Amino acid sequence: MRNSKDSYFFEDIVVESNSFQDSNKYINVESNILDLEIKGEYTLAKIRDAFAFHFQKYNSLGTKEIMAPVADFSFDMLVKDMKVISEVFIPELWVEPNSKISGRYFTDLALLDFNLNSPGIEYKQNILEAIDLKYFSSEQSSKITFDIFYASLANGLQIDSLILANQLRGDSLFFDFNCAIRDSIRSDIDLLGYAVKSPEQGYNFGLRESSFNIGEEDFFFNDKNLIHIDTGGVYIEDLILYGDGEKILVNGNI
């Protein structure tokens, strides 16, 4: 393999497949870069559509609806050494060895179960360490949880123990987000709330039992508030921030 500056040489890449059959297919790839196994009843287009069908739930505004494909498959990938791939195709990306991706898809209930575990990923000087992501979704609901031990952003911001859990039911998303930010002082953030697609092709957000601190000062949000976002901007209703014996009430358009 060659890019504009250098040549790269691979060790043996072993590919085993019976993909000409109509069902019970498998493809197995072994190399010094990664190992990959896909098996079941599938085509590459159906694998793409299985992910697209579920991810469209989170951003379906103005896009063509994708139907759940008829397929049943599982997949496993182990990253060994991505140095050559990164240097040739995406120099800004680095994936640590022993990163694992696995999952399965079933036609029944359009069930997608997806897991990602990685010691670390770096992209454009943004670094994530010890990543554990789980995604479980059916036609009725979806749940995502991820836990990142440490994040260092290109702007110098450092984040410890970033944890997110959310569940999507119909057009309503419920989320619980926690992290600790290290700058000149430490700030702990705890956000609990919801997001709902509105009939006006926008989103309604609300915070519940949410708080954060800046140094020794603690701040809290009221439970009854509304933030509406659409193409026309942002509308805020009854958002109150309490702290240090004072409060700030926000109402209006941004």
Would you name each region that the model predicts?
Residues M1-I254:
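Interface amphipathic segments
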